[in-house]
């Protein structure tokens, strides 16, 4: 897996984690219990395995997107450079 994570905030309302994925690295299959927002720090291509499907997303640095809770997925760096993003979980 070659992933590095850095938990930056962890309190009753939010959990903020920076993820660094080397080319080909992945997060491992997981599920978020709460809604969350992802903010890419670098441009890059993300490969996502979700619900038996393979999806691709081209990320643009600074352009955030929302994801709902409950979807099991594995995120891969689908590019040839390090992929860095910040994940903001909105805890209930």
Model-identified regions with their sequence ranges:
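Short, conserved beta-strand element in jelly-roll/cupin
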Residues: 31-47
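Conserved hydrophobic/aromatic beta-strand scaffold that supports enzyme active sites
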Residues: 7, 16-20, 64-66, 85-87
């Amino acid at each position: 897996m070659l992933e590095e994570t850095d938990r930056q905030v962890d309190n009753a309302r939010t959990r903020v984690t920076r993820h660094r994925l080397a080319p080909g690295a992945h997060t491992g299959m997981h599920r978020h219990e709460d809604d969350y927002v992802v903010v890419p720090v670098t441009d890059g291509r993300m490969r996502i395995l979700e619900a038996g499907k393979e999806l691709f997303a081209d990320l643009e640095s600074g352009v955030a997107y929302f994801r709902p809770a409950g979807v099991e997925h594995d995120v891969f760096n689908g590019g040839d450079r390090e992929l860095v993003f910040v994940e903001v979980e909105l805890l209930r």
